[in-house]
Amino acid sequence: MGNETVVVAETAGSIKVAVVVCLLRGQNVLLGRRRSSLGDSTFSLPSGHLEFGESFEECAARELKEETDLDIGKIELLTVTNNLFLDEAKPSQYVAVFMRAVLADPRQEPQNIEPEFCDGWGWYEWDNLPKPLFWPLDNVVQDGFNPFPT
């Protein structure tokens, strides 16, 4: 193998890893209304891109702090999904790593630190989630996913 150049077709999309935080408080989960070209005005769990060298737990704690100013107490892996966004202007693929977490201090309240990306945060009952849900979340909910311990 010499100095070979690999060219990726411009039509190929990107593959990213998103860490999704199912933050639980009692029987409620934290959701925000997205302000994004991807899933604008849908309700979503706090989430963000995994950075190089980061663990899933570190990413979840960092993203939650950046978006809501909340601190995680306990966190664990729940499930992983593969999500294709083929109908977008820039097709992409997201591997979504769902993590379950609880607050370090249950008295903490979420702050909307990034209003350019979220209209605000609220606590919602899992059995009565607001609509519309961001489609990757909607898909796992429709498949029977439940972030609460059994």
Swiss-Prot record:
Q: What is its EC number?
A: 3.6.1.68
Q: Which SUPFAM superfamilies match?
A: Nudix
Query: GO biological process: any one?
Result: dGTP catabolic process
Relay the pH-dependence remark from the record: Optimum pH is 8.0.
- Binding residues for Mg(2+), per the UniProt record? E63, E67
Q: In which tissues is it expressed?
A: Expressed in petals. Little or no expression in stamens, sepals or young leaves.
Reaction(s) the record says it catalyses: (2E)-geranyl diphosphate + H2O = (2E)-geranyl phosphate + phosphate + H(+)
Chief subcellular location equals cytoplasm
Location(s) in or outside the cell: Cytoplasm
Q: What class of enzyme is it?
A: hydrolase
According to the UniProt record, one GO cellular component term is:
cytosol
| Sequence ranges assigned to domain Nudix hydrolase in this UniProt record | 14-147
Annotated motif Nudix box, positions: 48-69
The record's disulfide annotation reads: none
**GO MF annotations, alphabetized:** 8-oxo-7,8-dihydrodeoxyguanosine triphosphate pyrophosphatase activity; metal ion binding
Q: Which UniProt keywords apply?
A: Cytoplasm, Hydrolase, Magnesium, Metal-binding
Query: What InterPro entries does the annotation carry?
Result: Nudix_hydrolase (IPR020476), NUDIX_hydrolase-like_dom_sf (IPR015797), NUDIX_hydrolase_CS (IPR020084), NUDIX_hydrolase_dom (IPR000086)
Tell me the function of this protein.
Involved in a cytosolic pathway for the biosynthesis of free monoterpene alcohols that contribute to fragrance. Lacks terpene synthase activity, but has a diphosphohydrolase activity with geranyl diphosphate and farnesyl diphosphate as substrates. No activity with 8-oxo-dGTP and dGTP and unable to dephosphorylate geranyl phosphate to geraniol.
Q: Which family does it belong to?
A: Belongs to the Nudix hydrolase family.
* PANTHER family on file: 8-OXO-DGTP DIPHOSPHATES NUDT15, NUCLEOTIDE TRIPHOSPHATE DIPHOSPHATASE NUDT15
Protein name per its UniProtKB record: Geranyl diphosphate phosphohydrolase
Per the UniProt record, the source organism is: Rosa hybrid cultivar
Q: Which gene encodes it?
A: NUDIX1
